[in-house]
Amino acid sequence: MQTAKKIVGIDVGKDWLDVCLPDGRKEHIRNTRSCRTKLIKKAAKLGAIVCFEATGPYEEPLADECLARSVKAVRLDAWGTRKFAESQGRLEKTDAIDCEMIRDYAASLKDEKLHFIKPRSEAQKRLKKSVRTRKNLLKARAIIANQFEDDLDPETARHLRSALNSLDKNIAKVEAECDAAIASDERLRELDRRFREVKGVGPCLSRIVLAQCPDIGDFNSKSIAKMCGNAPINHESCTIKYKAKPRRGRSDLKKALYMAAVSASRNNHILREFYQRLVANGKPRKVALTAVSRRIAILINTIAKHPDFKPAQDPKASAKAGGAKRGRPRKVK
């Protein structure tokens, strides 16, 4: 029988924290270091689990404070919290309601469904910040690049090109920072090397996996596929059966895996044959690419889980490397 858990639900904002304590009392405090410290000390005295939603960079200081004081913390999925609130008839959405729903949703989950935040190394923290910065710079570059038109006047075009050149330099610097963060940590460096031994997996996918999935290797095949958003999800109702389609998943990881699948379907001998077999059997090309991206996600997770695991190599390349020549066997007299 599941025992009742003490939960502190927190709705995190840029400037404010809305808190719902285990006894139902609510607080509205500033999102500053001193206020966060007082709040986590209070949670530690209560022996409570601190729960909050993923909000980009704003919940990171709160998570670090929990880890520093050995307080268990859980980062919940905002989609699940919202669906839980609607199931309780709470259609309104305010910060005060959100912190209460976060507390109630976490309390309703089984103990094994609460995935506690694990401490990150300094290299992992730097890598995560650099990957996020690179993403924002690429977004800014795309906005400026899309402003070029055929009838653009020369002066405006000059300003836009100057901005693009500046962004390109900054993107290169941030990518160098990502590589430096990986090189400074032995575990990250080894995983990066092993990931990139797989044809189709490049530096972009490797950085995103190491930055956004510090617990890579702890999943089974179904869990990693669902987390990456490339697992087919069944949708049935009585006699109606819809096509199983991937749903949700981590957006950045999903995009990076898809582009890796495009590369692997051309350059990776094993995955290319898998892709071509699916297309030959009538699967649409995008569905086949999604299946390839799922294979890559499972392969990366297996590499991280088993230090001695080595993915299968291209048999043609292996034969060349070993100097073996295939031909008809000689008859022995």
Labelled PLM ranges:
Residues M101, H159-S162, S166, I208, ...:
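Amphipathic alpha-helical interaction segments
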Residues H28-I29, S34, P203, R207-N281, ...:
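Phosphate-backbone recognition surface of nucleic-acid-processing proteins
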Residues Q88-E92, R248-R250, T302:
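Short low-complexity, flexible loop/linker segments enriched in glycine and/or proline
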Residues C238-T239, K243, F274-K333:
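Low-complexity, acidic/Ser/Thr- and charged residue-rich accessory regions of DNA metabolism proteins
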Residues L109-L114, I144, P214-D218, A264-I270, ...:
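Short helix-capping/linker segments at secondary-structure and domain boundaries
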Residues M1-R158, N165-D168:
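Phosphate- and other anionic-substrate recognition elements at nucleic-acid/protein interfaces
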Residues F148-C204, C213, N268:
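Helix-hairpin-helix/helix-loop-helix acidic hairpins
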